[in-house]
Amino acid sequence: MNFVLSLIFLALILKGVQCEVHLVESGGGLVKPGGSLKLSCVVSGFTFNKYAMSWVRQTPEKRLEWVATISSGGLYTYYPDSVKGRFTISRDNAGNTLYLQMSSLRSEDTAMYYCAR
């Protein structure tokens, strides 16, 4: 969690046309156990409100873990038991932004967090 900002550039080939998708995460930092943190991910390069979005994390041991998913309209959210009741995923479709509010943080939540389509 000590990595403050990560930037992901993905190149997609859609129907023979190259398209650049940008996902820019921010809000990371060092937090003591029991603390809270809110991450955000600003998206461009695709129609944000047409896709479900997720947060995933990579642990210090390089293990990938699914953290949360939200439906395209924001009505439905899904979490693994490990974060249920502590993490809240949300989205602002007008602002093309995905959020992850994390509370009651534990040492096992230490990871690099990424938004994903």
Swiss-Prot record:
Chain intervals for the UniProt region annotation (Framework-1): 20-49
Region (Complementarity-determining-2): 69-85
Disulfide bond residue pairs: C41-C115
GO-annotated molecular function: antigen binding
Region Framework-3, annotated ranges: 86-117
Name of the protein in question: Ig heavy chain V region 5-76
Signal peptide, first to last residue: 1-19
PROSITE patterns associated with the record: IG_LIKE
Region (Framework-2), start-end ranges: 55-68
GO CC terms in record: extracellular region; immunoglobulin complex
Miscellaneous comment in the UniProt entry for this protein: This sequence belongs to the VH7183 subfamily.
One record GO biological process: immunoglobulin mediated immune response
SUPFAM superfamilies listed in its UniProt record: Immunoglobulin (SSF48726)
Lineage: Eukaryota, Metazoa, Chordata, Craniata, Vertebrata
